[in-house]
Design a protein with these regions (language model features):
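Transmembrane alpha-helix signature in integral membrane proteins
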Residues: 6-37
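Loop-to-helix entry region at the N-terminal start of transmembrane alpha-helices
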Residues: 8-17, 58-61, 65-101, 190-195
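C-terminal transmembrane helix and the adjacent membrane-cytosol boundary/short C-terminal tail
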Residues: 35-40, 189-223
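Non-cytoplasmic
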Residues: 76, 147-181, 189-200
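Short helix-to-coil transition segments within interhelical loops
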Residues: 110-140, 167
Length: 223
């Protein structure tokens, strides 16, 4: 395995994690907002709609990632003219896997916003849309950013299934190396280098998420 191969794995892992997380938030953020707004104590309570959206989210969360990958192969093949063999062929399955998780994370983050601030906005005549865009999301932004980091780490973990469709990445590379060197893989420096690189990426995501969250968190701590 050459240095260029390792570099390719790193870029595949980072690229796949970033894009899948981005797409999952594009889809999951609106659903998370809807879950929060339409619940019993939300801005616009709607029992049947909240139940329906929640059912979609829960069903997607309950399907194992590997099964979703298999189900999505026809869709991936239709879009990319191939269902397996390249790093981008796992983007759609990873997005679907993370979508439900994102929706629940967003719902939870918005639920942390003080009811008093929402009531104050209502008293000032703000519409529901204005409350969502100018109160709920801005007030929950630190929690939302932390959620992004958590989701990104989970998505990176999902890339372990990339091995099953030849989609590449560090975790897939680690398992491939193991299958080809089952007798001496534990004593191989390369094997541990791949593991260390994976850990560094995970730590980088977590630290970046915490750093940004602290920077944008405007809440005052009372001593």
């Amino acid at each position: 395995m050459l240095f260029t191969d390792i570099l390719t794995m790193v870029f595949e892992t980072i690229g796949t994690t970033f894009l899948a997380t981005l797409f999952a938030y594009v889809l999951g953020l609106p659903f998370g907002v809807l879950l929060n707004v339409t619940k019993k104590t939300g801005l616009k309570p709607c029992g049947w709609f909240s139940t329906f959206v929640g059912l979609i989210v829960n069903v997607l969360r309950s399907i194992p990632c590997l099964i979703i990958i298999v189900i999505c192969i026809p869709v991936t093949r239709a879009l990319f003219e191939r269902g397996t063999g390249e790093w981008y062929t796992i983007l759609i399955p990873l997005t679907v896997c993370a979508f439900g998780f994102v929706a629940r994370m967003v719902e939870q983050s918005l639920a942390e916003v003080s009811a008093g601030k929402i009531e104050a906005a209502k008293a000032l005549g703000a519409t529901n849309f204005q409350i969502i865009t100018k109160v709920l999301i801005p007030e929950a932004r630190a929690s939302l950013v932390t959620g992004v980091a958590v989701v990104a780490v989970s998505v990176l973990g999902y890339t372990s299934f990339a091995y099953n469709i030849g989609a590449g990445g560090l975790i897939s590379g680690i398992y491939t190396y193991y299958t080809r060197h089952t007798g001496d893989y534990m004593s191989s420096i390369l094997f541990w280098v791949l593991i260390v690189l994976t850990v560094l990426i995970v730590q980088g995501i977590q630290e970046l998420g915490m750093f940004i969250a602290k920077k944008i968190d405007k809440r005052k701590v009372v001593k």
